Amino acid sequence: MMPRTIIEKIWDQHIVKHGEGKPDLLYIDLHLIHEVTSPQAFEGLRQKGRKVRRPQNTFATMDHNIPTVNRFEIKDEVAKRQVTALERNCEEFGVRLADLHSVDQGIVHVVGPELGLTLPGKTIVCGDSHTSTHGAFGALAFGIGTSEVEHVLSTQTLWQQRPKTLEVRVDGTLQKGVTAKDVILAVIGKYGVKFGTGYVIEYTGEVFRNMTMDERMTVCNMSIEAGARAGLIAPDEVTFEYCKNRKYTPKGEEFDKAVEEWKALRTDPGAVYDKSIVLDGNKISPMVTWGINPGMVLPVDSEVPAPESFSAEDDKKEAIRAYEYMGLTPHQKIEDIKVEHVFIGSCTNSRMTDLRQAADMIKGKKVADSVRAIVVPGSQSVKLQAEKEGLDQIFLEAGFEWRESGCSMCLSMNNDVVPEGERCASTSNRNFEGRQGKGARTHLVSPAMAAMAAIHGHFVDVRKFYQEKTVV
């Protein structure tokens, strides 16, 4: 057999029917659902008199539009109907549900891995674009639309066009203060928001190998912002150790057998990617987005670019539009940009590694008077673990708000929004116009960078923090 990439191996293992010159029919191992994109799909099943094909392969939670304060008091009528519909649909169709009373509740892309539902080699789908998060485990995971949600519910399969393969390799050693979020932002900043279109990315190199699973999930989460269908990292001992003893993982000899199978999930020597790019991890800095898409990003010690620095006319026009929306001027120093809000959370950066990084920055300090800062754990499990470690007290004593789990300020579908014209340092994944609220100005950063912005009221190079610690 010809050498294959891990992407090709997983794809080939899941083909139910090969489409000659057409999409392949893939078997789906895990279907994750939430309250926003599932109601219409269940209604479609009901109208056609169909059942959920594999309820045991389906898992639901509520996350997008639930409050993170007084979570049981949902005031928005649409949100309330969606949550109620999910409860009714899961009961009727026999689907497991982690509702607001469950210790398993949280953002769908956080709870899937921590419960052991997400495992190497699986095909995973969800009606949410950031399903690529699960690729951190060596799974092929991607978002789908509502009609596809219905198709998977009724057949446990999905027609998909075979993707091209793209290697993103980052070697070297990251500087102190440079995180997984900075790495993926640096990749997108260099190659743009469309370079991954039509591809599934495999992240390779020592920088990714040295990351925790939480950090790998951050990277794979933002594969979508690079335009890719999905992104993944081949499983290794770090992956296997994370998966061990999770609620839904195999146990004992079954787990050991699974690990032996998972070890084969790596790209063969001699396998050829359709495209490869390489970055030097030593040169990556803490990053801050300045514009209205994730590709408009620069090192924190940079200046907002001038229009003449863009060669393409469309890029110049987009930059001018960004200046106007973001309220910035060319040559303005990134570190001089003041913020009124700080959000630490989302499916990108709401796990224990993220909260520890942020807490490390603020211990013994106070949030600036001009800033409102909130921390939203990605799941009830993360919240409980953080409280066990005393992180909640560090945040509260510094002046942060400590919330219940949910998608929160990542998107303006719940009570947590940024007021019009105000600026937020956010650990989420999208800085589109209006993403955090009408007229809201979003700057994407790492948890460490967000925490420092909360303390100082403006962006600060977190590398200075580590330099000061070294001197002390």
Curated annotation (Swiss-Prot):
Q: Which GO biological process categories is it annotated with? A: L-leucine biosynthetic process
Q: Report any Pfam family annotated for this entry.
A: Aconitase
SUPFAM superfamilies listed in its UniProt record: Aconitase iron-sulfur domain
Pathway assigned in UniProt: Amino-acid biosynthesis; L-leucine biosynthesis; L-leucine from 3-methyl-2-oxobutanoate: step 2/4
The EC number(s) given in the record are 4.2.1.33
Query: Which residues are involved in binding [4Fe-4S] cluster?
Result: C347, C407, C410
What note does UniProt attach to the cofactor annotation? Answer: Binds 1 [4Fe-4S] cluster per subunit.
Swiss-Prot/TrEMBL cofactor(s): [4Fe-4S] cluster
| Inducing factors | By superoxide.
Q: Which UniProt keywords apply?
A: 4Fe-4S, Amino-acid biosynthesis, Branched-chain amino acid biosynthesis, Iron, Iron-sulfur, Leucine biosynthesis, Lyase, Metal-binding
Reaction equation(s) it catalyzes: (2R,3S)-3-isopropylmalate = (2S)-2-isopropylmalate
The GO molecular function terms of this record are: 3-isopropylmalate dehydratase activity; 4 iron, 4 sulfur cluster binding; metal ion binding
Question: Superkingdom of the source?
Answer: Bacteria
Known PROSITE patterns for this protein?
Answer: ACONITASE_1 (PS00450)
Claim: Lyase is one of the keywords in the record: yes
* Enzyme class name: lyase
InterPro entries of this UniProt entry?
3-IsopropMal_deHydase_lsu, Acnase/IPM_dHydase_lsu_aba_1/3, Acoase/IPM_deHydtase_lsu_aba, Aconitase_4Fe-4S_BS, Aconitase_4Fe-4S_dom, IPM_dehydratase_rel_enz, IPMI_cat
Q: Which family does it belong to?
A: Belongs to the aconitase/IPM isomerase family. LeuC type 1 subfamily.
Question: Assembly and partners?
Answer: Heterodimer of LeuC and LeuD.
Q: What does the function comment of this entry state?
A: Catalyzes the isomerization between 2-isopropylmalate and 3-isopropylmalate, via the formation of 2-isopropylmaleate.
Q: What is this protein called?
A: 3-isopropylmalate dehydratase large subunit
Source organism: Bacillus subtilis (strain 168)
| Organism phylogeny | Bacteria, Bacillati, Bacillota, Bacilli, Bacillales
